[in-house]
């Protein structure tokens, strides 16, 4: 029985890779063991799991299409960017029921110009904290959130974990720094906005909802920190 089962699993993975590649491009989907390995374990080595494939979208639209596909085909999704967490939240679960992919946000690393009047920028979820800092400092400002993993940790991850860091007592956590956020729900619906409005009277205030949600509610793709 092992032969047919293995063949079936290979066929499912092949079809999954083909479908994901049609969304983000073949160069940004891989299922081979060597390339997956760096995404299947956290940097401490304590938490590991196996994914069927890794997909690296370039923008919110591609994230939305990936999530819609996975939702429709019962494929689990693990969101990952800098992979600097210490509790295994960014790697596949070893006891997962069914196939899963790692959704890497590293390519969502664009940053807009600093708006001196609002003191905010538009940053992709995959932008590192260090790049956010550099942009702010060029404009004569600094970031209220800072921590040792700044060169690898990302804006999206910092929001999802509601990170604080060494300046948290003075400035608060990421929840206090973000005025706008763009995210994608599990079914591919894009929510939120990247406006500078401190309060919205229509619908949910997505920065407050998603800060600290650890990826359980939506995938953050961009923000206004």
At which residue positions do the language-model features occur?
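N-terminal flexible segment immediately upstream of the FAD-binding catalytic core
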Residues: 1-68, 85-119, 134, 148, ...
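Residue-level detector of anion-binding/catalytic polar loops
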Residues: 75-76, 142
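Glycine-rich beta-strand-to-loop/alpha-helix junction loops that act as flexible
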Residues: 80-84
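FAD-binding subdomain of flavoenzyme oxidoreductases
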Residues: 110-225
């Amino acid at each position: 029985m092992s032969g047919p089962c293995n063949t079936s699993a290979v066929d499912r993975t092949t079809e999954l890779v083909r479908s994901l590649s049609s969304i983000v491009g073949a160069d940004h989907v891989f299922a081979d063991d060597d390339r997956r390995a760096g995404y299947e374990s956290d940097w401490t080595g304590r938490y590991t799991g196996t994914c069927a494939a890794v997909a690296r979208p370039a923008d919110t639209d591609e994230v939305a299409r990936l999530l819609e596909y996975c939702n429709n085909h019962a494929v689990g999704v693990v969101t990952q960017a800098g992979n600097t967490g210490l509790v295994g939240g960014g790697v596949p679960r070893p006891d997962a029921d069914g196939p899963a992919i790692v959704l890497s946000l590293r390519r969502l690393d664009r940053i807009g110009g600093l708006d001196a009047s609002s003191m905010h920028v538009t940053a992709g979820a995959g932008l590192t904290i260090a790049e956010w800092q550099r942009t702010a400092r060029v404009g004569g400002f600094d970031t209220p959130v800072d921590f040792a993993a700044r060169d690898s940790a990302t804006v999206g991850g910092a929001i999802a974990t509601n990170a604080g860091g060494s300046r948290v007592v003075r400035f608060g956590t990421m929840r206090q720094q973000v005025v706008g956020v763009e995210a994608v729900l599990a079914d591919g619906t894009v929510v939120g906005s990247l406006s500078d409005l401190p309060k919205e009277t229509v619908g949910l205030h997505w920065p407050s909802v998603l800060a600290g949600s650890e990826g359980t509610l939506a995938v953050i793709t961009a923000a206004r920190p």
